[in-house]
C-alpha cells in the first residue's frame, strides 16, 4: 500500500464481524498453524454408549468401542413457503432419497457389525407408525409402570421428555418439556427396582426402539435395559453419562399387535457402579415428521 496507508494495520472482516484471516486453512499457514483446529487424541477408552450384551460375539478388533456420527444424506427443509428436498431432482430421484437407500440398510449395519456405535440424527427407521410411552402422559399409546423393592423412584431435578401435542413449533425442544424419573443404582438383589414401558403396537411388524434419559452428574455408565419382543429378550447396557436429552437407539425388533407384557422395554437399577439411573420416554418406530413451518408439517 502507498504511504501513509502502509503504516496502518488493516483488519478484514465479514458481515458477521469474523476476521477473514481465521478462514485461512492450516495447510496454508506454515508454522503458524491454529492448534485449536487439531483433533489431537480422539481415542476413547471408556464404556460404550450402547452395548448389546446378548449378542453371541464381541469383536476384539475392528471398530469395537468407536462412536460414529453418520448422516444418511440431506432431507426436507422449509424454504419459507413450503417443505421441499434440499437437493435437485435427477433421474426421477434426489440425493436426499437415493443415498439413504445405501446408508441405512447397508452401511450402518456394516459399521455396527464391526463393533461401532452409530448415531444418526436423521431417522433410520422407515416404519411409518410410531408409539411413544412416557412417564408424564398416560395415553392409549401404552403404559408406564414402576416397581420398587427397598429403593424408590423419584422425580429428577432436571427437565425430561414430554410427547408433543400434536406437533412441534420452531424453538420447541420436547426433551425439556417434561419430567424424568430417577432411582439409586444398586448391586443388592433386595433393592432392585424397575421401570417398564409397554406400548400398544398399532400393527405387527418391525419397530426401532429408542430410549431417553435425563442428565445427572452421577449417572451410571451401565444402565441395564431389557427389550422384550414377542417374548424374546435382548439385554443392553447404556452409558447414561453420555447421550442424554435425545433418542438413544437400541435396535430394531419384531413386535406383535396390541399391548402385551411380551412386548415392552424394562429398565432396572442393577449396576456395578454407585450413582443414579434415570428413566424417561421410550419410542417404538420411526413415525412421520411433526415439525410445523408455515401452515404445513415436515
Model-identified regions with their sequence ranges:
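Short beta-strands within extracellular/lumenal beta-sheet-rich domains
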Residues: 178-201
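A short beta-strand element within beta-rich, extracytoplasmic domains
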Residues: 193-217
Amino acid at each position: 500500500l502507498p504511504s501513509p496507508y502502509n503504516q496502518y494495520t488493516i483488519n478484514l472482516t465479514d458481515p458477521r464481524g469474523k476476521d477473514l484471516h481465521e478462514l485461512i486453512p492450516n495447510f496454508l499457514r506454515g508454522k503458524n498453524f491454529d492448534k485449536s483446529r487439531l483433533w489431537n487424541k480422539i481415542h476413547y477408552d471408556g464404556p460404550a454408549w450402547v452395548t448389546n450384551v446378548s449378542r453371541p460375539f464381541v469383536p476384539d478388533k475392528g471398530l469395537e468401542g468407536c462412536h460414529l456420527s453418520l448422516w444418511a444424506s440431506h432431507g426436507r427443509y422449509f424454504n419459507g413457503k413450503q417443505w421441499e428436498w434440499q437437493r435437485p431432482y435427477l433421474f426421477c430421484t434426489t440425493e436426499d432419497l437415493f443415498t439413504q437407500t445405501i446408508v441405512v440398510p447397508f452401511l450402518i449395519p456394516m459399521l455396527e457389525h464391526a463393533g461401532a456405535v452409530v448415531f444418526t440424527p436423521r431417522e433410520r427407521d422407515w416404519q411409518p407408525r410410531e408409539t411413544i410411552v412416557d412417564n408424564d402422559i398416560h395415553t392409549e399409546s401404552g403404559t408406564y409402570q414402576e416397581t420398587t423393592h427397598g429403593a424408590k423412584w423419584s422425580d429428577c431435578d432436571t427437565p425430561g421428555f414430554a410427547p408433543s401435542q400434536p406437533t412441534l413449533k420452531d424453538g420447541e425442544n420436547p426433551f425439556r418439556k417434561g419430567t424424568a424419573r430417577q432411582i439409586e443404582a444398586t448391586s443388592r438383589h433386595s433393592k432392585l427396582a424397575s421401570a417398564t414401558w409397554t406400548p400398544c403396537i398399532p400393527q405387527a411388524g418391525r419397530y426401532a426402539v429408542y430410549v431417553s434419559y435425563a442428565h445427572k452428574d452421577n449417572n451410571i455408565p451401565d444402565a441395564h435395559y431389557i427389550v422384550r419382543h414377542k417374548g424374546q429378550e435382548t439385554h443392553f447396557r447404556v452409558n447414561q453419562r453420555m447421550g442424554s436429552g435425545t433418542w438413544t437407539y437400541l435396535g430394531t425388533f419384531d413386535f406383535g399387535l396390541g399391548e402385551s407384557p411380551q412386548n415392552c422395554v424394562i429398565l432396572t437399577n442393577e449396576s456395578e457402579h454407585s450413582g443414579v439411573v434415570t428413566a424417561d420416554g421410550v419410542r417404538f418406530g420411526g413415525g412421520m415428521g411433526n415439525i410445523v413451518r408455515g401452515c404445513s408439517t415436515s
